């Protein structure tokens, strides 16, 4: 995997697999694209690395502006083209990253591990419990970690910026059979008494994207 001579962010795609989101190859998830979209919109250097590529040829963790790990596989399953990141692998990446480098971990697996008692002690490590992309954006603007949710305007901007991000252009499956998943809304009408196996009700009242924004995102991709 190519290394940048300049300091850059490292985005590790640990994949997501939710009842309403497929992010395990050949799918490229929308949440990882939003994260890359934040970095794209701020013109920051970054490297995109799927966890399967990380296992084969780990990128250098030195000289990084920061490391972002998305771990969102919460549905048990068997996969044909990839394997989501494990808690053990997440721990190893964190321990191998220089102490002065900020680390942001997000995704529903991170929330699940935290609820099960995982509470790593490390300087400048943040476990995002809301939108990872919005949390990252706030950190880049203020230098402070805080749980944030994206606004409708941010959703549009980061979705469209993410459509042409390295999560797509540097994806190992770009030549085929990469499948680009699109998020049209989040949440569930049964947010008070939703299905116990599903996490969508936990996102609250449904929020819909504007159809024109979705069409533009797809046209960019």
What spans do the regions from the language model cover?
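Acidic, low-complexity intrinsically disordered segments
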Residues: 2-216
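Short Fe-S-cluster ligation motifs
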Residues: 217-221
């Amino acid at each position: 995997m190519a290394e940048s001579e300049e300091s850059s962010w490292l985005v590790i795609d640990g994949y997501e697999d939710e009842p309403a989101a497929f992010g395990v190859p050949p799918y490229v998830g929308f949440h990882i694209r939003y994260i890359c979209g934040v970095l794209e919109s701020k013109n920051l250097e970054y490297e995109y690395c799927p966890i399967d590529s990380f296992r084969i040829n780990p990128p250098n963790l030195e000289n990084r502006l920061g490391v972002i790990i998305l771990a969102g596989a919460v549905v048990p399953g068997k996969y044909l083209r990839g394997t989501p990141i494990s808690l053990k692998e997440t721990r190893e990446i964190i321990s191998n990253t220089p102490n002065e480098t900020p680390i942001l971990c997000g995704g529903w697996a991170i929330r699940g591990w935290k609820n099960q008692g995982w509470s790593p002690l490390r300087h400048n490590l943040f476990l995002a419990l809301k939108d990872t992309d919005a949390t990252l954006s706030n950190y880049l603007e203020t230098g402070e970690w805080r749980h944030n949710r994206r606004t409708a305007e941010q959703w549009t901007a980061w979705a469209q910026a993410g459509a042409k991000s390295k999560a797509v252009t540097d994806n190992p499956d770009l030549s085929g059979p990469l499948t680009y998943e699109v998020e049209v809304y989040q949440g569930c009408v049964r947010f008070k008494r939703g299905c116990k196996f599903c996490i969508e009700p936990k996102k609250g009242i449904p929020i819909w994207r504007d159809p024109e924004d979705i069409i533009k995102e797809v046209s960019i991709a």
